[in-house]
Amino acid sequence: MSSFHKNSSYMEDPDYPGYSGSQNHTQNYLRTQDDLEFPGCLDNPGFHHPRRNPYSSDSRTNPDYHHSLAEPDYPGSPSDADYQNTRCHPRSAHPRTRPDYEPDYEPDYNDFQSESYHPDLSMEPDYPGSHGHPGFAGVRSSVNSTGPRTNLGYLDLEEPDYPGAQGNSYHSGPRSHSNLPGSRRNAGYAGSRINSYPDSLGEPDYPGAENQPNSPDFYGKPDYPGAEEGDVYSPSKTLGVIGRSRGSFGILGREDGDYPEGIEMASLGMAGDPRNGYVNPAYMRGSSPVCPDRNLLLCARDWNTSPQGQKLIASLVPMTSRDRIKTIRNQPRTMQEKRELRKIVDKEKNKQSHGTFEANCCAQCLSSLSLAYRRTKSSLSELLNYISLWQKRFKVIGGKFGTSVLSYFSFLRWLLKFNIFSFVMNFSFIIIPQFTVGEKNTLQFTGLEFFTGAGYFRETVMYYGFYTNSTIRHRMGGASYNMQLAYIFTIGACLVICFFSLLFSMAKYFRNNFINPHIYSRGIAKLIFCWDFTVTHEKAVKLKQKNLSTEIRENLSEIRQENDRLTLNQKLTRFSVHVAAWLVSTGITAACCVAVYYLAEYNSEFLKTHKNPGAVLLLPFVVSCINLAVPRFYSMFRLVERYEIPRQEVYVLLIRNIFLKISIVGILCYYWLNIVALSGEECWETLIGQDIYRLLLMDFVFSLADSLLGEFLRRLIGMKFITSLSLQEFDIARNVLELIYAQTLAWLGIFFCPLLPFIQMITLFIMFYVKNVSLMMNFQPPSKAWRASQMITFFIFLLFFPSFTGVLCTLAITIWRLKPSADCGPFRGLPSFIQSIYSWIDTLSHRPGYLWVVWIYQNLIGSVHFFFILTLIVLIITYLYWQITEGRKVMIRLLHEQIINEGKDKMFLIEKLTKLQDIERRANPSTLVLERREVEQQSPLHLEELDAAPDLRLRRSMQEENAIA
């Protein structure tokens, strides 16, 4: 086997034709042992040549040796029946086993050294007993043999057979001199470790190779007698290497050949280790022991001492902290190497700045503060992610059902945060002060109050009518607390903060999901080629795999939907169906609103004449039934409309359902503000609060029953009775509209029932776990995978308009136009709720220190012109932002098309280059041999596959030449 030097040229290769063949091959041979990519390298696990020599007289596999492991049974071996008690070449006149044997260092065939190479000769010697002899059973070069290497039909290019190669015995170099004095390949040599068989084990045969001190065999252990007594080489190491060396060809050679040259070779790491006594010269002399043929910047060791590493460190020192961190972060290194690089750069920077410490004191302080700020920010971010609600649950849901179903639970958690904030505000500034002056409740609690909200709860902090209108002052001359201002400012602050939070959230999600360049590339590179290697837990790995699979299906579905095109008739048909569905849904919504209004009036008249506590539940029960049944009827329209894109179907259902629910809430608000508030009822604010509480509670009960009973029964029917139904899919539109409807009621009732955010918080917390369990048990993943990156943005938009804006309009009418109750609430006795603000401003106008507050109110808050100018500015900024967004979209689209065109240009050039190379190969087929050698040298791991499979390219070229001939 040739020993190719990766860092040398072909003229320095011992197997190259015309190589002079130095008698001393020790250095060149050993130099290849630490070349991991050399096909014949001892350290190459894919090398399949033998390590154990069954022919050596001193080998441990020799049957005469008392520790023999195997006995060869080939012709001419001691185990063969026809063996004539000789070990040397059958034509040798002096066999070593004869008593009168004398070492003969002359060649045992005639005129060996005098024979020169002739072009007409075959590629291998043909003397008697040689592989090249025509009469030899295992001949390779005989034209009559089925497998000669010089035959055109034989495509095995395992070893070169040109003059000067190891397989050619006419080569004048020492490797082919099997009978050269002192050669290991000479059968007459007493210390030989290999057989006279040419190229039997791929070992060096140069003179004196056996004199290397403690020279190991190919198992990492010497094969001379008594080797097992050494302290350096233990049997455990030998057995370990033996296990690695047993490849697909066995120990003795190829399965289809008569020569032992196909045995797999393992690493010589133990042999080359200086600790074993044997010091490989190449081990100590390599140009780069760590990374001999790679970039030093990517090396795992001593990278900082290389010129490239020093240059990198020198370039990082003058950088700012931000740029230095960004540069180190982008380095293709492990985290440990990046930390070491940062420490080295910090040390170098400290050395350079040691003399100018006083001058750079401020800069160092700023750098330290910046570093502390970044670390604190990172720690807080990690803490928030760690304590984030249901983080693991979200990963499971997203991995199994995709981002579309996950968007519902993300929206639910987002609403829960809103209600937690509102409850904290109300509890801190309204409820706690009222506890200090509240009177004891004398009503009896019966339990029915949980459903009706009346009775015992009427005289608690739950409703508006219980709060005092006085100024709280615990001692004379102390600080006072105006309950009227606290009530209206706290409710107003909650609504204002919710307003800006909704705007900020819509802007953030809009920027991430609508202006993201991934809408053109879809993040394919990140999706396919990125893997979080910090994920090591088996369950987490499987979950990550599910996530990747779901995201890939979502991206593929979008690509397929973009390529679908409809004909004109199909478009007209679908348009007609959509118009009809919209007309039917609008008519149903109008009918439901009319029914709810007349039911509310009838129920109010009925309650005046009947004192039945359960009668108050009739209106919320009917409204909840409508909200449960009508959206399911809307969902059946999908069978007729047949939307190809699932996102469009969800959008249409959302709009229809929100139109239904908001219309019902609007009719109820009209009834409350125009019928109940003007009816002269005692404490009408508390009555409205009770109605909203009952609506919210009844909606929660219906949702709970639908999840625990309805969805469970639907699963049983689909699995047991009507199997064609199978499992149902999660209805995102209907479930999201339930959340929006409940949150609308919570915002609407926050003025009349300050504890309503707390009730909504409890219901959302329970609904998450109920929906999660029902989802895992009763639903299947969506049949059409689709991404829902823009769904949360649409949900928040629907929550903002018309839900939140409708609530603001209703509360504005209540505060500015309606008269408060005369006997209850903090605003009792006032002509309007806003009158408390006017009285406060009048009081501040008589105090010189607060005149700036009066000016702000009169010229900004209370001025119509200010709000007109502010609205105009907001619209202008929105328009400019929209134009910038559209411009960026166009630029992103152009850049994306440019990248695609550049890729097409490269593919065109590659195809042209490939065609030119094919034409050149057909014109000069001999270049295929050198190309094969380059492939073997560059890809040693595939050497076994290349040897086992024929060279299809060579066969194709030869067939074309034969056809032309």
Swiss-Prot record:
Main location: membrane
Transmembrane segments: 418-438, 445-467, 485-505, 579-599, 614-634, 658-678, 692-712, 748-768, 795-815, 860-880
Cellular component GO terms, alphabetical: plasma membrane
Region (Disordered) residue spans: 1-235
Topological domains, Cytoplasmic: 439-444, 506-578, 635-657, 713-747, 816-859
Biased composition (Basic and acidic residues): 61-70
Keyword Cytoplasm: no
Parts of the chain on the Extracellular side: 1-417, 468-484, 600-613, 679-691, 769-794, 881-965
Membrane topology: Multi-pass membrane protein
Biased composition range(s): Polar residues: 1-10, 20-31, 166-181
Gene Ontology molecular-function annotations: mechanosensitive monoatomic ion channel activity
Listed InterPro entries: TMC, TMC_dom
Residue positions where Phosphoserine is found in the record: S248
Keywords linked to the UniProt accession: Membrane, Phosphoprotein, Transmembrane, Transmembrane helix
Subcellular localization: Membrane
Role: Probable component of an ion channel. Molecular function hasn't been characterized yet.
PANTHER family: TRANSMEMBRANE CHANNEL-LIKE PROTEIN 5, TRANSMEMBRANE CHANNEL-RELATED
Family: Belongs to the TMC family.
Name of the protein: Transmembrane channel-like protein 5
